[in-house]
Amino acid sequence: MLLVRKWLHTCFKYWIYFLPVVTLLLPLVCYPFLSISQKIYGYFVFTTISSLGWFFALRRRENQLKTAAVQLLQTKIRKLTENNEGLRQIRESLKEHQQESAQLQIQSQKLKNSLFHLQGLLVKTKGEGQKLETLLLHRTEENRCLKMQVDSLIQECGEKTEEVQTLNRELAETLAYQQALNDEYQATFSEQRNMLDKRQIYIGKLENKVQDLMYEIRNLLQLESDIAENIPSQESNAVTGNISLQLSSELKKIAFKAENIEAASSLTASRYLHTDTSVHNYSLECRQLFDSLREENLGMLFVYARQSQRAVFANALFKTWTGYCAEDFLKFGSDIVISGGKQWMEDLHSSREECSGRLVIKTKSRGHLPFRYCLMALNKGPLCYHVLGVLYPLHKEVLQS
C-alpha cells in the first residue's frame, strides 16, 4: 500500500511530462500504419506539438521550483524570526506594511476607478458644454437676426405711423372742406325749399281757383241738362248728339287733368322734401288722381288697363245706378250688356284715341236701360296706356235717383 501511494505521488508530481512523452511516442506507434507523405507531415506536426509541450513543461517546472524556493525561504525566515525577537517584530512590521500597502493599493485602485469615472463625466460634461456653447452661439445668432427684424419692423411702424398721421391730416382737411360744402348746400337747399314752399302755396291757390271753375262748369252743365229734359221727344236725336259732345268735352278735361297731374306735382316741393322711391311716388300720384276722379259726377267714370284687362278705378255710380260693379261690364261675353257689347269691347281695346257709342244695360232695379259711353286713351302721366271712360244714362229717372 505504501508503494502504491508513493507511486501515485510520483505520478501526480511529474504529470506535466506525460503530454510531451505521449507526443513523441505516438508517431513511433503509428509509424507502420502511415504513408510516406503522412509520415513526413506527421513527424513535422508531432515534433512541433512536442516542442510546445516540452516548453510548457519546462515553464511549469520552473514556476514550481520558484514557488518551492519562495516557500523554503519563507520557512527559513519564519524559523529564524521565531528564535529572534527583533526579527519577529521586523517580520510583523513588514506584514503590517504589506497589509497597509495592500489596503493602499485597494484604495488607490478605487481612486483610480473614481478618477476614470470622473474623467468620463468630465469628458461627457465637456461634450455637453460644447453642445451648449454651440446652442448658445446658434441662439445668439437667432437673437441677432430677430433684433434686426424687430428694428426693421419698428422703423417700418414709424414710417406707417407718419403716413397715418399725414392721411389723418388730409382726411381732416377733406372733411372740413366737405363740411363747408355741406353747409353751403344746406343753405342753398333751405333757400330752394322756401322758394318751393311759396310755389306750392301759389299752386294750391291756383288749384282752388280751378276747382271753383270746375264747380261752376258742372253747375252750368247741370242747368243745360235740366233744359234738355224739357225739350220735346221729337228733338231726342239732337239731344243725344249734344250729350255725346258734352261727354267728350268733359272727358277731355278730366283726361287732361289725369295726364298732367305728374307735371303739377313736379312744380311742388313734395319731391324735394321727401326721399321716397319711384314706386312710392307712382302710387302716391295714382292715389291723388283717383281721389280727384271720385269727386267727378259726370257719370259712371272708370279707368281700364288694356294689358291686364281689368278696371283699376271705378266710381260709386256703377253700384248706385246699375247694382253691379265695373268688372262685370268689362268681361267678355257678359250678360249684363244686352245690346252693343261687341262694339263696346272693340272700342275698349281699340288703338283710337277717342271712341263713343250706345249700350243697353240690364240693371237690378230698373230693368234694361240705355247708356251713352265715351272712351279716351291716356298717352302720358301715371296712367299712361290706360283708357279713361264714362257711361252716362239717357233716362231722367236714373239721374234723379
Swiss-Prot record:
Signal peptide residue numbers: none
Source taxon at top rank: Bacteria
Family label: Belongs to the UPF0242 family.
Protein name: UPF0242 protein CPn_0755/CP_1117/CPj0755/CpB0783
Species this protein is from: Chlamydia pneumoniae (Chlamydophila pneumoniae)
